[in-house]
Swiss-Prot record:
It comes from the Viruses. GO terms for molecular function: host cell surface receptor binding; sialate 4-O-acetylesterase activity; sialate 9-O-acetylesterase activity; sialate O-acetylesterase activity. Residues 7-127 are annotated as: Esterase domain 1. Residues 267-379 are annotated as: Esterase domain 2. It is found in: Virion membrane; Host cell membrane. The chain crosses the membrane at residues 393-413. It is a single-pass type I membrane protein. GO terms for cellular component: host cell plasma membrane; membrane; viral envelope; virion membrane. One of its GO terms (biological process) is fusion of virus membrane with host plasma membrane. SUPFAM superfamilies: SGNH hydrolase, Viral protein domain. This is Hemagglutinin-esterase. Pfam families: Hema_esterase (PF03996), Hema_HEFG (PF02710).
Length: 424
């Protein structure tokens, strides 16, 4: 009880000396159990293979290159590897997961399945995909890719229907129409299998619009049926538009099992790759660094849309990306954000990372870790410390209860002692 005024006094003295402990705009970790997924801006192998070895190409401090805690690939992203033939097997595990990738699939690439398609739909797909990845990596330690085997009993093969520039979609796969079918009004099925992981992220996609082929319009219809549990997942085309639509994808989180892919109209699609989620962990928010181009190229904000508290903290620079190696590699602002990976930090919040766990002038929003006591520390001529009143109220209640108990005990013993003297 007598220590409280001293604590407040010491805190005020600290405040008068300028101690503030604000949240910092970095990504960091509580301890050594962390992992980063990235692209060329954190791809140490890419830099090693350039001549000369110019580490200004990266936003990552080269001291982390031998940490064994980075899975990055120049020119790629997790979304790009998930859907397209341009594939890198991102693999990593940690309690605290950080993502700094996504820029290698943006409006700059202008991808769309057909000439009359829509890149806006693919940006929507990107946002939905990363939402599932971020949410699930807050509760899983391990991420990697796995192939999804499937069995189709017809003679038709998969076809590269959806492609643009150098990007060719191969997940999900399109099964071409059988030669004996005169149109796309038919039902067809394929078996596929998920095994070896705790859960999987798989795509379920349709053309949401009137798909034209040989003067006929078709409504896409795709389903996945879990033959072990009887659960069915499905999408049907609901739009009446004939141009400006594209491949709308939902990203399902499925358990291991035997599945049936079913198409009631148009082409059958079946997943060929999945994100493999393994090793459940205590809830730990992921951290995402904005992945964007210099303003000379068009970027998107889909990773920011996907990264929402409480499962995700988003970090961004307030200025244009201007690299020192070239305009898209080696930006000082993003290098500063990644510098937090060089040290441990006790507390994470929506506003940033706190370097100390004692007091702060900022109340941590969606805090995780050992976070500072809320305090508003000011520095006028006479320092004033205004602390969060809740702990003081609770302390007062506890002290009041303790006083009542002591008084009751004293009265009890006094009455009991008086009774004994009277009896004597």
């Amino acid at each position: 009880m007598f220590l409280l005024p001293r604590f407040v006094l010491v805190s005020c003295i600290i405040g008068s000396l300028g101690f503030d402990n604000p949240p910092t705009n970095v990504v960091s970790h509580l301890n050594g159990d962390w992992f980063l997924f990235g692209d060329s801006r954190s791809d140490c192998n890419h830099v090693v293979n350039t001549n000369p070895r110019n580490y200004s190409y990266m936003d990552l401090n080269p001291a982390l290159c031998d940490s064994g805690k980075i899975s990055s690939k120049a020119g790629n992203s997790i979304f790009r590897s998930f859907h397209f033939t341009d594939f890198y097997n991102y693999t990593g595990e940690g309690q605290q997961i950080i993502f700094y990738e996504g820029v290698n699939f943006t409006p700059y690439h202008a991808f769309k399945c057909t000439t009359s398609g829509s890149n806006d739909i693919w940006m929507q797909n990107k946002g939905l995909f990363y939402t599932q990845v971020y949410k699930n990596m807050a509760v899983y330690r391990s991420l990697t890719f796995v192939n999804v085997p499937y069995v189709y009993n017809g003679s038709a093969q998969s076809t590269a229907l959806c492609k643009s520039g150098s990007l060719v979609l191969n997940n999900p796969a399109y099964i071409a129409r059988e030669a004996n079918f005169g149109d796309y009004y038919y039902k067809v099925e394929a078996d596929f299998y998920l095994s070896g992981c705790d859960e999987y992220i798989v795509p379920l996609c349709i053309f949401n619009g009137k798909f034209l082929s040989n003067t006929k319009y078709y409504d896409d219809s795709q389903y996945y049926f879990n033959k072990d549990t009887g659960v069915i997942y499905g999408l049907n085309s609901t739009e009446t538009i004939t141009t400006g639509f594209d491949f709308n994808c939902h990203y399902l989180v499925l358990p291991s099992g035997n599945y049936l892919a079913i198409s009631n109209e148009l082409l059958l699609t079946v997943p060929t790759k999945a994100i493999c989620l393994n090793k459940r962990k205590d809830f730990t928010p992921v951290q995402v660094v904005d992945s964007r181009w210099n303003n000379a190229r068009q970027s998107d904000n889909m990773t920011a849309v996907a990264c929402q508290p409480p499962y995700c903290y988003f970090r961004n620079s307030t200025t244009n990306y201007v690299g020192v190696y070239d305009i898209n590699h080696g930006d000082a602002g993003f290098t500063s954000i990644l510098s937090g990976l060089l040290y441990d930090s006790p507390c994470f919040s929506q506003q940033g990372v706190f370097r100390y766990d004692n007091v702060s002038s900022v109340w941590p929003l969606y805090p995780y870790g050992r976070c500072p006591t809320a305090a508003d520390i000011n520095n006028p001529d006479v320092p004033i410390c205004v602390y969060d009143p809740l702990p003081l109220i609770l302390l007062g209640i506890l002290l009041g209860v303790a006083v009542i108990i002591i008084v009751v005990l004293l009265l009890y013993f006094m009455v009991d002692n008086g009774t004994r003297l009277h009896d004597a």
